[in-house]
Amino acid sequence: MYSSKQHVNILTALLVAHGIRHAVVCPGSRNSPIVHNLNECPEIQCYPVTDERSAGFYALGMIQKLRQPVVVCVTSGTALLNLAPAVAEAYYQQMPLVVVSADRPLEWIDQLDGQTLPQPDALGRFVRKAVTLPEPHNDDLRWYCNRLVNEALITRHGPVHINVPITEPLFDYTVSELPAERKITWTPADISPTTLNHVTRMFLQSKRPLLISGQPMNPLFDEAVLMIGDDERYVPDFVLYIGGSIVSKRLKRFLRKAKETWVVNATGEVTDTFMNLTHVVQGDGEAVADHIRYMLVTEPHPFVQLWDDLLLRVRQMSEAYKPAYSQMAVVKYFESRVGDEAIVHYANSTAIRLANSFAKHPVFCNRGVNGIEGSLSTAAGCSVVSDKEVYCVIGDLSFFYDQNALWNQNLQGNLRILLLNNGRGGIFNMLPGLEQSPARDAFVAAEHHTSAEGICRQNDIVYLRADGPQDLQQAVDTLLYIDSNRPVLLEVFTDVADDERVYRDYLSVFR
């Protein structure tokens, strides 16, 4: 029988899954659920050592002989600190020492409770990875716990620290078997032909494979997922994910239905966006994608064709939609006029979501953390090292937040700004339930009545404006084609209620 502590059982199951076969265990009550589990596992041989400092080196000696990861398990408090010499030695020898420390609950740290000190990151830079496991009480926390243990155990070339806070009761051993836990596997850098062929074979042999590029051109995935609805024919069983973060929350929720995901990235980081990651391949995602595309030419896959047909229908419907005057109409017209080779920066929030639907060329956007600050400065920085026009499509809050980007003597006439001003953060009108809060407009969406005209005047920026459909096309064309040695800004004023209504109407086309 195993401990009743879910995170201890998740940890134990994954230690076994990742091939841990030896554990040095030290005495204590707080770590007793972990020690009990390790002793119960027929796959793991336990070796008791009383002195923690000595125990760390016992484990190190085993690693040197076995060339395998070995666990050293200690109780809470200074017991962990006694491992520091062995951990430092393992770090410089690049030995896979797995430190598992029991801990007191977070709320009791620094409260003069016994054997209690801040244990997360206590081993500092001498470990390659340090994680602290939550005590799960829902599916999200169980997934998080699984992910953290996997992240630690696939870390290479040095020691790792897994810290396990455990609440009382400690001595309840009523679980008959360990959970079946998802194991994440890691493949090293420099994708070999063998690895490339293996990934491609996994893709082509799956019944419903889907290749997802994090930031593709004109993906229309939001619209496609709306069209799919509850049609299970489109749900993939295997997702190959490359590239950066995905804009569409709806797509991310949809892909969490898949059975498994493989991620290809340059760093080998565990990015479990869809909560079903099973394999991390460190390497060039574009090389993998290009190889799969090449193979699909000679071996067309019916599921890929099903999705291609769907996306073609979605694109045709999107192109046929005629939005009333709104921010959507502005961006759609702008994208119909700007060249395919244009350098276009989109700010976050509503702007990038409109680009997701209507941009047919590569776009730039700060989608690392997705903040509203710095979008204009990023476009400005691009413009000073480019001999082409650089466009920035930006909402009012992002613009006013970053207006100092225009306070720079290096700016030239190749910087063109399309400012979408509806007097607030319009995306907050799209969040269901927020309309019930009287604080939404003034405090959440930052409602305002500000114009960029004065900012342009003080920074010698050519200022244009459009207030309605009668002005729009001429104003956008002027922004695109005017000859100027100074930056040009077009401020388009829309009504936030119209923007919301048009956006919802557009999405309804695909339901």
Where are these regions (language model features)?
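Phosphate/pyrophosphate-binding active-site segments
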Residues: M1-S3, L255-T350, I455, A466-R511
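Active-site diphosphate/adenylate-binding microenvironment
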Residues: V8-V16, C26-R30, I34-N39, D308-D387
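Structural signature of the thiamine diphosphate
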Residues: H22, K65-V74, L80-N82, A90-L97, ...
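Glycine/charged-rich beta-loop-alpha catalytic/anionic-binding loops adjacent to active sites
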Residues: L38-Y47, Q64-V70, A355-V369, E435-P438
